[in-house]
Structures are given as C-alpha cells and as structure tokens.
C-alpha cells in the first residue's frame, strides 16, 4: 500500500491552495492529490467566458505541469476515491488501489443543482461545471440557434452573455421577481434588465420551468402559466450542491456540507475539509475566493499551524459589454441609503449604512471608485468620513 503524509482528495482551487501552503511549510513531506477529472487544476470561474472563445486546455491551468514536478507534488488523475477508512487512515480508489495517509483534506467540490423539472434528462439540457462540460457544450451549441438559460444569477448572466457573443437568441428564465436578487436591489436590477433587453435578451421573471419539451431531444420549455419557449439548447445555472457521496456514510459530520470549525478541521482529528464541499457557520459559500482562502488555512494547519478562517464579505463584479456592475457587503439590512445618480451617463451608485457605518454598496456604471468603495465596506468606514472624500453621495 502506498503511503503519504498529506493526501488531498480533489484538485479544485481549495485542493491546490492547500498543496501550495503545505509545501511552503513542509519542504519534504509527501503530498498526493487525487482527482476524477483528467486535467490539472484549472480556472473554473473562467469556463463561462471561454464558451465563446477558442482555447487550449493548458491556457486554463492555474499552475503548469512543471510546477507540480518542481514542488514534488504527485497528482493522480482520472481516479475516484470510493471509500475512506477512518480507523486505519487510508482510502480506496475505484481501481482497488489503497493509499494510506497521516493528514487528509476533503476538497471534493460541488456539482450543479438541476431542479426537479419534467423531462430534464433530454439531450440538449446541460450544466457547466467542468472543463469536460465546456467542450461538450461548445460542440453541441454549434447546431443551436435558440438557447435558454434557467437561472438569472451571476453565473447565469455571464453564460447568457457568452451565448449572445456566439450569435444565439437567448432567453433568461429567473424564478425570482428580479435579476441578481442576492447582489442588487430591485431598482438597480430593473436598470440591468432594461439594458439586457436592449441587447436582445428575452427575460422571463417570476418564472419556473415546469417541463422540458421534445421527444428525447430538447425543443423547448414549458413555463408556469402555460407559456412556452422554443429552445434547441438549455443551460441550467441554478446553484450548486456539495459532493458528499464519499463522506455521507462515514463518521465525518456533515449537514448541507462537511461541517468544519474555524481551523477547517472536521470532527475527525486528522481530517480537514475546504472549498465548495464545506459548511462553516451554517453556510455553504461555493465561491472561488472562499475556496482559495480555505485551502490556504487548511493546508497550513495540516502542517501543524493553528490559523483561523474568517468568512469573507461578498464582492461581485459583472462586466458585459457596456454593462458594468459592482456589489459589496450587506444590501438588505440597513438604516439609510446614500445615492449618486447621473442619468445622462447611466450611472447609479448606492452606499448602504447602518449606525452611520458603510456596510454595503451597489455600483451601476462607472466602476472607477470600485476599489475605494470595496475598502470602505471592508473597514465599515463612517459615511461622514467617506463623504468628505467623495462628495457625490447625499
């Protein structure tokens, strides 16, 4: 049986960040990463962008193959970990191979959530989560003219824009009463909707896909209210669910995700978890930046450190052609809103305050002050102090 000091299951950004941090703190300890995918860690957050671009797989890699060799990190690809033997500190792969470990990191990531829609298994309905998905979707789209997007969140809109760049007719179906409900208030979301409509997008709000139409192959969608949309391709962007199959029937505690403490430790002494698979403080974030930071903390702690992970404030940037958006912090629990508007230039900025401190912001158009405002949200700057430097806000 092969043995290693550090075993990482998964090679997403959390797994890679952990491996980097382990090697920074332990130059000699053996590190093995195992992944069911056929590619080294890549920029998953760029997949939607590359729907409308020609590229090589290597362009998407976070670190090239030579980096792993230089750092003496062994990566096992195209293998699935089928079982964790917590008592004997070993895992079993789908080919029967066993690997023993001293410290284990679970970084198995997440999978797309496909809502329970009648006919959802028809050819032509897909979700974009992996590089393999991207290659399949790009090929399938070559024969599509009308494509529908189920989900009007951030990733959904980015995908919709990529589809428009491929000269597709694009419909966006959103269950909520307005787009980006987590990042925007209704007033600014309405402005975004207007802009998207001007670019030719068809938008269906407060809408739910009830049935995928077609005889084995997608031809359309039936919405609530008996409305129908013709579609020869459907991309679902309805969120994620942690990959818990490996740990579900072990002693590792899990709920919506693998439950960890502020050190990214599970309830089992030598087992850690990080990334999309993790639940911390009752939350599953599913964010690239969070996965990166969690991986760093977990990796360092696997070498004996006692670092703490702090939940980040959420920042969102969306740039699609002439459309520019930035959202930061808390926008749904505040005392007052301070605004700056320039209708001629189509700019609308809002600062949300609580107890006279800036707790959140939304910028629509002109993002030059984005970093300044981001820092003000992070530090909860006094609105009075901020206005002294930026008198646009009232």
Describe each PLM feature range.
Residues 221, 227-253, 324-394:
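C-terminal catalytic lobe of FAD-dependent flavoproteins
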Residues 121-142, 213-222, 227-300:
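FAD-site-proximal beta/loop scaffold in flavoenzymes
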Residues 2-74, 160-183:
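Beta1-alpha1 glycine-rich phosphate/pyrophosphate-binding loop at the start
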Residues 1-7, 61-148, 221-226, 233-238, ...:
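FAD-binding core/adjacent interface of flavoenzyme oxidoreductases
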Residues 136-184, 218:
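Rossmann-like NAD(P)H-binding beta-loop-alpha module
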Residues 28, 75-93, 99, 166-262:
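A Rossmann-like FAD-binding core segment of flavoenzymes
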């Amino acid at each position: 049986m092969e043995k290693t000091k550090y075993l990482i299951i998964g090679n997403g950004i959390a797994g890679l960040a952990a491996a980097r941090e382990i090697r920074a703190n332990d130059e000699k300890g053996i590190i093995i990463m195992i992944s069911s995918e056929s590619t080294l860690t890549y920029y998953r957050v760029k997949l939607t962008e590359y729907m409308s671009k020609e590229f090589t797989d290597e362009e998407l890699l976070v670190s090239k193959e030579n980096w792993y060799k230089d750092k003496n990190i062994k990566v096992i690809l195209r293998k699935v970990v089928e079982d964790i033997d917590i008592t004997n500190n070993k895992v079993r792969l789908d080919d029967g191979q066993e690997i023993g470990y001293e410290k284990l990191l679970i970084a198995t990531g997440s999978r797309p959530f496909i809502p329970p829609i009648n006919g959802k298994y028809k050819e032509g309905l897909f979700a974009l989560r992996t590089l393999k998905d991207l290659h399949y979707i790009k090929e399938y789209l070559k024969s599509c003219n009308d494509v529908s997007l189920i989900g009007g969140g951030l990733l959904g809109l980015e995908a919709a824009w990529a589809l428009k760049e491929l000269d597709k007719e694009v419909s966006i179906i959103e269950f909520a009463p307005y787009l980006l409900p987590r990042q925007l208030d209704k007033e600014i979301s309405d402005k975004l909707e207007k802009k998207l409509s001007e670019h030719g997008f068809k938008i269906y709000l407060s809408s739910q896909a009830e049935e995928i139409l077609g005889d084995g192959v997608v031809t359309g969608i039936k919405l609530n209210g008996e409305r129908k949309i013709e579609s020869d391709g459907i991309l679902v962007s309805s969120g994620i669910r942690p990959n818990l199959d490996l740990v579900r029937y072990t002693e590792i505690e899990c709920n919506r995700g693998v439950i960890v403490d502020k050190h990214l430790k599970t309830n089992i002494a030598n087992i850690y978890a990080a990334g999309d698979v993790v639940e911390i403080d009752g939350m599953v974030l599913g964010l690239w930046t969070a996965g990166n930071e969690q991986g760093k903390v977990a990796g360092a702690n696997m070498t004996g450190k006692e670092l703490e992970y702090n939940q980040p404030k959420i920042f969102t940037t969306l740039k699609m052609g002439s459309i520019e958006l930035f959202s930061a912090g808390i926008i749904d629990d505040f005392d007052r809103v301070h605004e700056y508007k320039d209708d001629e230039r189509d700019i609308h900025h809002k600062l949300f305050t609580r107890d006279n401190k800036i707790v959140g912001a939304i910028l629509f158009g002109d993002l030059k002050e984005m970093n300044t405002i981001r820092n003000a949200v992070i530090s909860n700057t006094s609105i009075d102090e901020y206005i002294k430097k930026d008198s646009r806000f009232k």
